[in-house]
Amino acid sequence: MPPRRYNPDHRRDALLERINLDIPNAVAQALREDLGGEVDAHNDITAQLLPENSHSHAVVITREDGVFCGKRWVEEVFIQLAGDDVTLTWHVADGDVVTADQPLFEILGPSRVLLTGERTALNFVQTLSGVASEVRKYVNLLEGTHTQLLDTRKTLPGLRTALKYAVLCGGGANHRLGLSDAFLIKENHIIASGSVRQAVEKAFWLHPDVPVEVEVESLKELEEALKAGADIIMLDNFDTEQMREAVKITRGQAQLEVSGNVTIDTLREFAETGVDYISVGALTKHVRALDLSMRFR
């Protein structure tokens, strides 16, 4: 069973297991959106203008620097559209740094299928590469500190595991995958439970092997969470002086996570206070796609 204290390796393994189930479903949903509600390439009426027996060779390039992510989603798009009739040749792997004008992969197959799958495939890889690229910028700023970058549950609907995978490819780590794999006790939970101690004790009783995290908004609440035995304590909207004081008070009794008011400009300053984790919702909420293009040869 996983340890109660947060374990990035366990979270990673759980995510990769979920991904195996989620990719086919996510791709099928995206294709249905594009093809009139069913995964049928014949519903692309513009592609029907091409001869049925026409075959083409295309290459996908990046127009800007970044970090690549999304290989399996691209493969799944063309598997669902054409089975083995499309051949993909890869020049990069997930997590690779890419530079402007670099070829990423090549596609050989029926011209109609290549055109039908183009936008769906690029939507996935541009979105995931955009997240991985942004995460890498944050991770690079943490170099030399012991602080680890975490994502959050603030993800685009339907793309939770995909976006969290992109965070891994960028060098970050995953917070909770969902509501079932860790406790995160916030203000309303505490009010409804009666106290921090009561909430934490109930969590330990319900699932002794699951991490228990408590969100606090003051140093007083921090001390209450420590006394209750929380594994992880989230410092919500603390300033840097409060963060340093929290590190002194905690003395390794729990892991500390910073959340709120985190930007690429404040990240390093927060990390240098000595906290264990910094979580950033914007990584998977404010997504900027990487600029990619597919060109027929």
Could you say what each language-model-derived stretch is?
Residues S293-R297:
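Active-site loop ensemble at the mouth of alpha/beta enzyme cores that anchors a bound cofactor
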